[in-house]
């Protein structure tokens, strides 16, 4: 039977969804982070998870556990964000030599539970966050907006639907990502060296020493092609913000816009599908020996509003007053 319920996971208030052989715990007070997604039947933990994590641990390092949703993700040079009708100065929260603003604030805010319910097909949670003068970040970015998140769990996995609504009278920058943390190994009893990652990619986006785009798009080298042909081990080596244009790949002979992680000895896979709004992948693994890696889908390049490249290359867009932007993701195992 599919269910939803209010619960507490080691001190962290959550809504638990159970459906289709999966269980998901969403910490609505920590940015609606999916702090655990488990395929119960196959013994797979999709996202980085520790049963010892307290609420305080998750709050202090929200970017590196579960599925954190980021608004204004990754880096903005010197904290500057230029839109078509304004220039905003965000706090520089990444120290020298980087000196950038990084990752925004949405993933650290207390979200509101709108509703949760289950039926014979699925279990659903809807949360929201209203950004206005009450948010301490508003002095840097005085643009009202609303974020609505819908999580649907079923036999088809977990769907994550993101909606951004501009409630201001000015242009609202659109740059959205999830700092997706994949447990490594993800299968009970498996070994990280047996994992292989497939990421269908186009050009590599060159980054400078501050982890900002040089605006050069590079042809793929042999190490890049390991992502494309599915031979890349995402652990036990340092993958440090490898950034690429996203392309479509194949899953069981069908077009698949997303990444696939496989445990080679068993053939078990995590399939991570995203909607076309996500135009870039960044791969990062915290030096490769900490039990997780991050295939991060982004709707726009790092520092996109400040770049000289055209919007159809950077992915950057803006919402007019009362406009709505939506993007979707789905996680499932095979």
Q: Where are the regions a protein language model picked out?
A:
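Beta-strand-rich N-terminal accessory domains
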Residues: 1-95, 252-278, 287, 323-332
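Extended, loop-rich substrate-binding clefts of extracytoplasmic carbohydrate-active enzymes
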Residues: 1-9, 18, 86, 91-154
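Acidic, contiguous internal or C-terminal segments within carbohydrate-active enzymes
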Residues: 17, 28, 39, 129-180, ...
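Short, conserved secondary-structure segments in the cores of folded domains
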Residues: 77-78, 137, 315
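A short, structured loop/turn motif at beta-sheet edges
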Residues: 82-86, 115-125, 152-157, 186, ...
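Active-site/ligand-binding surface loops and adjacent short beta/alpha elements
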Residues: 89, 171-172, 181-275
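Acidic/His-leaning functional-site neighborhoods
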Residues: 100-112, 116, 230-314
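Intrinsically disordered, low-complexity Pro/Gly/Ser/Thr-rich segments with frequent PxxP/GP/PP motifs
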Residues: 314-325
